[in-house]
């Protein structure tokens, strides 16, 4: 089931219809959420929004679209987050891999969603631009290579003006790393 508070674009309605996925637009019917086993939340929806608070009160798991897509990919993931430079870094990595003949996709906060990319393609590598909002609701997500470009006070309205909460969201990119994964960061940034 898919719900959109606004109007769903025609091209996405066609995808939903073609895959026999029920949907609603222009609002949310709470009972439909309350019957869900899990909710995949758009990163633009705050964890403090009324609907999310109500869903959480029913102990229904809420995950991000990034977490959802992660369950269905075998691609080697390179995740990039930070306050500035994400798009440039992702574009450069994508260009380098593509120029070297690798099968590589680009998704997340740049281009298509990770879910759409995963459903439509089978790339060897996927470069993901990841905002703090996209990382807020990850559970098992684990890129093989994680990059944090830098950290500056940004989007603090989403984090109750708490910079450390914002930093914690960014560091979720490595929360499931093991000794076989890689973490690249800006050593000159004293916030990392």
Segments (PLM) and residue ranges:
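Phosphate-binding loop of NTP-binding sites
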Residues: 30-36, 43-187, 191
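NAD(P)-binding Rossmann-fold cofactor-contacting core
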Residues: 1-14
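Short, conserved SAM-binding/catalytic segment
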Residues: 11-21, 120-121
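Glycine-rich, highly charged phosphate/nucleotide-binding loops
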Residues: 17-32, 167
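Residue-level marker of intrinsically disordered, low-complexity segments enriched
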Residues: 19, 37-38
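Short beta->alpha connector loops at strand-helix junctions that form conserved
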Residues: 3, 26-27, 66
């Amino acid at each position: 089931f898919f719900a959109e508070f606004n109007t769903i674009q025609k091209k996405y309605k066609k995808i939903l219809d073609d895959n026999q996925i029920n949907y609603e637009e222009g609002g949310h019917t709470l009972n439909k959420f309350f019957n869900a086993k899990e909710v995949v939340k758009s990163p633009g929806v705050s964890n403090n929004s009324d609907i999310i608070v109500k869903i959480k009160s029913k102990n229904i798991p809420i995950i991000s679209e990034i977490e959802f897509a992660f369950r269905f990919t075998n691609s080697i993931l390179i995740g990039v987050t930070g306050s500035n430079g994400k798009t440039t870094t992702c574009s450069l990595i994508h260009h380098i891999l593509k120029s070297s003949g690798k099968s590589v996709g680009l998704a997340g906060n740049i281009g298509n969603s990770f879910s759409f990319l995963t459903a439509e393609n089978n790339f060897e590598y996927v470069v993901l631009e990841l905002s703090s909002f996209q990382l807020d609701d990850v559970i098992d997500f684990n890129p093989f290579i994680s990059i944090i470009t830098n950290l500056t006070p940004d989007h603090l309205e989403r984090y109750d003006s708490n910079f450390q909460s914002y930093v914690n969201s960014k560091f979720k990119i490595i929360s499931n790393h093991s000794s076989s994964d890689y973490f690249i960061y800006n050593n000159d940034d004293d916030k990392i």
